[in-house]
UniProtKB/Swiss-Prot annotation:
It comes from the Bacteria. Mg(2+) binds at residues 40, 113, 116. Belongs to the ribonuclease III family. GO terms for biological process: mRNA processing; regulation of gene expression; rRNA processing; tRNA processing. It is an enzyme of class 3 (hydrolase). This is Ribonuclease 3. SUPFAM superfamilies: dsRNA-binding domain-like, RNase III domain-like. It comes from Variovorax paradoxus (strain S110). Keywords: Cytoplasm, Endonuclease, Hydrolase, Magnesium, Metal-binding, mRNA processing, Nuclease, RNA-binding, rRNA processing, rRNA-binding, tRNA processing. GO terms for cellular component: cytoplasm. Digests double-stranded RNA. Involved in the processing of primary rRNA transcript to yield the immediate precursors to the large and small rRNAs (23S and 16S). Processes some mRNAs, and tRNAs when they are encoded in the rRNA operon. Processes pre-crRNA and tracrRNA of type II CRISPR loci if present in the organism. GO terms for molecular function: double-stranded RNA binding; metal ion binding; ribonuclease III activity; rRNA binding.
Length: 228
């Protein structure tokens, strides 16, 4: 098996009995007619149930409406994108040549969908208990509390507040490249924290979305350094 897939299984703490499921979960529709969208559909349901169970047990005093609000925040694309970055899924995605050239490996929607597909693949490979255990491991790095807003702080705001809290200047964003046809452009944006000598890139369907993706990548970098 490819070394990258072996390392991914170690990060997931799940060894696939059927490695074809793992490969399928990482296959975008631009790569093959046999792609991950059905697994994504399944994984979305498994994720929602696993997160619902997690919240039901952890936030036992919270009423239904508030549980739904917190769950919506935990399963939205921004959260899944950041978890996918932590798992280092980008270089393992199987994308068509055009999608790969236009920034697909770093596109938040593609990464979030692949994460859901992975959860679906674990469910088919080993059942709900294994999939739920994976979800709980993934969310160990996510702060869960009853006051989580329906729309949580976006990555740019979170990064800005962290830098200000550490008496550092605001990050610098610049468009490194504009990719794709004029009617379907994607923006490759660089986020730089000069005082730390750090740069990260992000891809989005607009400049703002690219900045958010780059900020999310920077937060992951800071977390890996033990800073954030």
């Amino acid at each position: 098996m490819d070394g990258g897939l072996t390392a991914l299984q170690e990060r997931l703490k799940h060894s696939f009995s059927d490695t074809r499921l793992l490969q399928l979960a990482l296959t975008h529709r631009s790569f093959s007619a046999d792609h991950n969208e059905r697994l994504e559909f399944l994984g979305d349901s498994v994720l929602n149930l696993a997160v619902s169970h997690l919240l039901y047990t952890r936030l036992s005093a919270l009423p239904e409406g508030d549980l739904s609000r917190v769950r919506a925040n935990l399963v939205k694309q921004d959260t899944l994108h950041r978890l996918a970055l932590e798992l280092q899924l980008s270089p393992l995605l199987r994308l068509g040549e055009g999608e790969a050239r236009s920034g697909g490996p770093n596109r938040p929607s593609i990464l979030a969908d692949a994460l859901e597909a992975l959860i679906g693949a674990v469910y088919l490979d080993a059942g709900f208990s294994a999939a739920e255990a994976l979800v709980r491991r993934l969310y160990e790095s996510v702060e869960i509390n009853p006051r989580m807003d329906a729309v949580a702080k976006d990555p740019k705001t979170e990064l800005q507040e962290w830098l200000q809290g550490h008496k550092m200047k605001l990050p610098v964003y610049r468009v490194a490249a504009t990719l794709g046809a004029a009617h379907k452009q994607t923006f490759d944006v660089e986020c730089e924290v000069p005082e730390l000598g750090l740069r990260e890139r992000g891809i989005g369907g607009s400049r703002r979305a690219g900045e958010q993706a780059a900020a999310a990548a920077m937060l992951i970098r800071l977390k890996a350094r033990g800073a954030a």
